[in-house]
Amino acid sequence: MAMSVNVSSSSSSGIINSRFGVSLEPKVSQIGSLRLLDRVHVAPVSLNLSGKRSSSVKPLNAEPKTKDSMIPLAATMVAEIAEEVEVVEIEDFEELAKKLENASPLEIMDKALEKYGNDIAIAFSGAEDVALIEYAHLTGRPFRVFSLDTGRLNPETYRFFDAVEKHYGIRIEYMFPDSVEVQGLVRSKGLFSFYEDGHQECCRVRKVRPLRRALKGLKAWITGQRKDQSPGTRSEIPVVQVDPVFEGLDGGVGSLVKWNPVANVEGNDVWNFLRTMDVPVNTLHAAGYISIGCEPCTKAVLPGQHEREGRWWWEDAKAKECGLHKGNVKENSDDAKVNGESKSAVADIFKSENLVTLSRQGIENLMKLENRKEPWIVVLYAPWCPFCQAMEASYDELADKLAGSGIKVAKFRADGDQKEFAKQELQLGSFPTILVFPKNSSRPIKYPSEKRDVESLTSFLNLVR
């Protein structure tokens, strides 16, 4: 059971607001490494044990107190201490997530802002998660927005930040990476080390650690995660949860709550909402960008491709997370499948009757043939990979289209215990990898594009077969 403990004093900010008219409208502030999120503080109420305050507990003896009579004084002390005992509220967020499972994003957003006030903020990446800001605006409640400026964002994203601030009349609170850490990384490995040894180290310096500092000043945060963004890693995101990775203002495990108002919303519905509400959007979207991150690690995707294919495209599908939402990555999915531990757990893909299924021996024999009578096109795939799943329809269509043409269309499952073989012998870099074995040639040619529609694959075949 996921629970969060919220400790509140009997002297609450709500009481002060209603009785004395003190405005609790949140202050927009810089939440850099030198200053955390501004908070409204309520002066602590000190205990008065002098006996001069009137006690709510009547003395046991109505006669005047004497020097030797300590019972009334003890009763007074107990009563006054009792007045200041803090109330501990235990929230079951698993149960709350169930109650809100079918709620609208607006209802979830309103609940989050109502519950946490100035202690919650929206994490804004500069993409379609601007929908979160629109939902917060529609609640009529004050809200805060922060963003991670990695120093490597697209110029279009910076201009978009400015447009959002002007549209909503807000100030986005930017978090920056530690300059010493960035200098150390760049001087030791260069500006583009992530192309060589993966993006995790760079993301840790430029994104994860700045985020950790920002969240230390909050009790909750709001993200734009959706289940359909990455079926392999985000398919079980709840609408609200105790953050399994980061700590909040009070410190310790369970001190931060994570809200995901659009977890159950599909990407198309988000865009319909943005168009209907005439919300400003990042101009990169019009250029084919869907998932937007840092400039060196983001590119446009083509029709039919999954949106996350535009991020860290040189890495395996299972690596397409930067670490900000590590707690939502399914721990037992990809790793087990890659190691061949759960082959039967995922249904196979590419099921056209005109498609040849190759075994390890079959593809080894195909590689040995130096004078093939017909060309082959083979996809190296893993059925759990969302990018392989995304091209299933087009590849099956290709097999049906080429049936009887003299071109063989085949598949080879290259995960699990076949992965190392595929890396060494078949040029496997990430899933899916497509190879063409030309006629009268033993060396396969790797398809270089991520455009996997029927027309593009057919055109490539005609050029190299």
UniProtKB/Swiss-Prot annotation:
Localization annotation: Plastid, Chloroplast
GO cellular component terms, A-Z: chloroplast; chloroplast stroma; plastid
Keywords for the protein's UniProt record, in alphabetical order: 4Fe-4S, Amino-acid biosynthesis, Chloroplast, Cysteine biosynthesis, Disulfide bond, Iron, Iron-sulfur, Metal-binding, Oxidoreductase, Plastid, Redox-active center, Stress response, Transit peptide
Active-site residues from the entry: C385, C388
Organism domain of life: Eukaryota
Activity regulation, free text: Stimulated by sodium sulfate > ammonium sulfate and is sensitive to inactivation by 5'AMP.
Catalytic activity, as annotated: glutathione disulfide + sulfite + AMP + 2 H(+) = adenosine 5'-phosphosulfate + 2 glutathione
One GO biological process term: sulfate assimilation, phosphoadenylyl sulfate reduction by phosphoadenylyl-sulfate reductase (thioredoxin)
Pfam families: PAPS_reduct, Thioredoxin
UniProt note: pH dependence: Optimum pH is 8.5.
EC number assigned by the record: 1.8.4.9
Tissue occurrence: Leaves, roots and stem.
Cofactor(s) required for function per UniProt: [4Fe-4S] cluster
Keyword Transmembrane attributed: no
PROSITE patterns listed in its UniProt record: THIOREDOXIN_2
Cystine residue pairs: C385-C388
HAMAP family: CysH
Function: Reduces sulfate for Cys biosynthesis. Substrate preference is adenosine-5'-phosphosulfate (APS) >> 3'-phosphoadenosine-5'-phosphosulfate (PAPS). Uses glutathione or DTT as source of protons.
The name this protein goes by in its record: 5'-adenylylsulfate reductase 1, chloroplastic
